[in-house]
């Protein structure tokens, strides 16, 4: 048996630069991890089946599950003769902008690499993972990073300053492809990637909070105004900075002090079913 942890990610910044010839957007984003985790265990099987065990109403256990697809890809790539049972204990909210599915897929690639003693490098696993998901290369490493291209080009950055994170997911799901289709690249939106990069370089917490920016946020807010209300609620309750992560709908707030973080947590706990008080990892 092999055990892997799959932490959630949040975006400090997210920008889309142009539409690529392959139909995807060229993206530029700075991401880090928080200590909200899915936990996965892996067992070899005597047959060649891939079995995903998960108790969650909204997460499939078939080929639509990214962990299943990662296992399928891994077994094909390394021509394995055995299948695997993957058990997922899910804590990361689903369709939330926190890369829960990608984190599980990345953990699956790392886990099978160990389970079958393949000895592939993390770089090799990241390249493999990029075939099925843009956030998977980042999730292979679980380090604070600037990600460009489709997300597969990674530059590691300093860990962020120590802080509390209040994560709140409104009671709705958002499809990332649907949000990306609505991007208007002619419309100006300032994303502070350089400011965030420098803030991490200098471990400047205040500058980090000022740099939080996401081009997808106004698009998701136009469809779901409660995202903006939630963000404003966090800021009014004392968050040093707040932002929607990914394509949403999860909003997070940053706080330096635990008492401050608990105030924000209590302020938003009544309006969302899924609220978490966690720490930055990076």
From Swiss-Prot:
Pfam families given in the database record: GHMP_kinases_C (PF08544), GHMP_kinases_N (PF00288)
Protein name: Putative 4-diphosphocytidyl-2-C-methyl-D-erythritol kinase
Keywords: ATP-binding, Kinase, Nucleotide-binding, Transferase
GO biological process, one term: terpenoid biosynthetic process
Enzyme Commission number, as recorded: 2.7.1.148
UniProt enzyme class: transferase
Annotated active site: 9, 135
Lineage, top ranks: Bacteria, Bacillati, Bacillota, Bacilli, Bacillales
Keyword NADP on entry: no
Catalytic activity as recorded in UniProt: 4-CDP-2-C-methyl-D-erythritol + ATP = 4-CDP-2-C-methyl-D-erythritol 2-phosphate + ADP + H(+)
One example GO MF annotation: ATP binding
UniProt-listed PANTHER family: 4-DIPHOSPHOCYTIDYL-2-C-METHYL-D-ERYTHRITOL KINASE, CHLOROPLASTIC
Family classification: Belongs to the GHMP kinase family. IspE subfamily.
Annotated function: Catalyzes the phosphorylation of the position 2 hydroxy group of 4-diphosphocytidyl-2C-methyl-D-erythritol.
InterPro entries according to UniProt: GHMP_kinase_C_dom (IPR013750), GHMP_kinase_C_sf (IPR036554), GHMP_kinase_N_dom (IPR006204), IspE (IPR004424), Ribosomal_Su5_D2-typ_SF (IPR020568), Ribsml_uS5_D2-typ_fold_subgr (IPR014721)
Residues the record lists as binding ATP: 93-103
